[in-house]
Amino acid sequence: MSRTKVLESLVDGRATREGTQQFRKRFANAQPDHFYRPLVDGAVVSSLGLGTYLGECDDAEDARYTATVIAALDKGVNILDTAINYRCQRSERAIGEALHTVISGGDIKREEVVVCTKGGYIPLERTPPATKEGYRGFLHSEYYGPGIMGPDDVVSGGHCLTPRYLDDQIERSKKNLGLASIDIYYLHNPEQQLDVLPRPEFLDVMRAAFTTLENQVRRGVIGNYGCATWNGFRVPPENRNHLNLEELLSVAREVGGEHHHFRVIQLPVNLAMTEAVRTPTQKIGSDRVPFLEAAHRLGVSVVGSATLVHSQLTRSLPEQLHSAFPGFSSDARRAIAFAQSLPIAAALVGMKSVPHLEENLECPKTS
């Protein structure tokens, strides 16, 4: 089946508690039991997730990602992370190609895989425009002209969270992924809006975005939603770009009631970026605690990103970390082991080669 037909025929269903538990049982002999962990909605995910951020915008890179996603699903990884802007939409499409292959072949059921994507940054189409004029022309033809968003909706040259824009991006992501429903949909670095907006106006933006996402949940288009951040939850309250989890949960309850679907946060946590573990950035009532403690208290799942910090943690780690993580033959696996030792659902690692996938999967087997 051609990729065009895949886009026209979306796979129904989404990840379920029962489906992901069945996936876990199927790999009982290949992965230790602690390799799988629950999200707050009961679905179970592998503690190593596959990320798709880096890479060239070309067909060869697409093929590498597709092959690695297929291999990951075959080896017990069932949480896939991407974003519509990654590699000019190619990362979503590579995942879609892989999912079509394994689902249509009967190797994997849709209900067994947790697929996550993000919206916020304006995605390009296959390759970046060659000039600034080309980019401006792209914005006008693709977004401004059709009325999906206007120039005043765009922050920092390429970030937007308006309701109509988010609705549009979700539909595009569905087609890219070949899926009728997305399991986790993140607002991508919402703290970017705080570069220009006062906090009260920012909360209005988040309120409107959460309302849009709750409506998408009711339609069955997404399962749960959250925020995928870089700085927001790691910086202190005094920082302009600070995000407070309790405050955002209050907004979610305001628009979605006590049974809202704001349930997952993604943020960097690794050997080099330990703020989520050590730095008390979050206020809960009169307490000030690190983010991971706040998430635990407030009942929000956490997915860790930048586990290897774009390969920076794959070499030259201090000798004391070798003794702290005995039995590991590489710094990459020590860094992954650190992330997997934390109270998070999954640690994301960008992987676009099967040998790297296989090396990284050795980590939980020897811990």
Tell me what each language-model feature is:
Residues M1-S141, P146-I148, R164, A180, ...:
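N-terminal binding-site loop/beta-alpha segment at the start of enzyme catalytic domains
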Residues S2-R37, R164, E171, H188-S367:
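Beta/alpha (TIM)-barrel catalytic core signal, keyed to glycine-rich beta->alpha loops juxtaposed to Asp/Glu
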Residues L50, L80, I95, V115, ...:
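Conserved, mostly hydrophobic/aromatic
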Residues G51-R64, P151-D167, V196-P200, Q320-S329:
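Active-site mouth loops of central-metabolism enzymes
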Residues R64-T68, D168-R172, R334:
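Well-ordered alpha-helical segments embedded in enzymatic catalytic cores
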Residues G76, G178-L179, G223-G226:
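Alpha-helical hinge/cap motifs
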Residues H159-S181:
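An active-site-proximal structural segment forming one wall of the substrate-binding cleft
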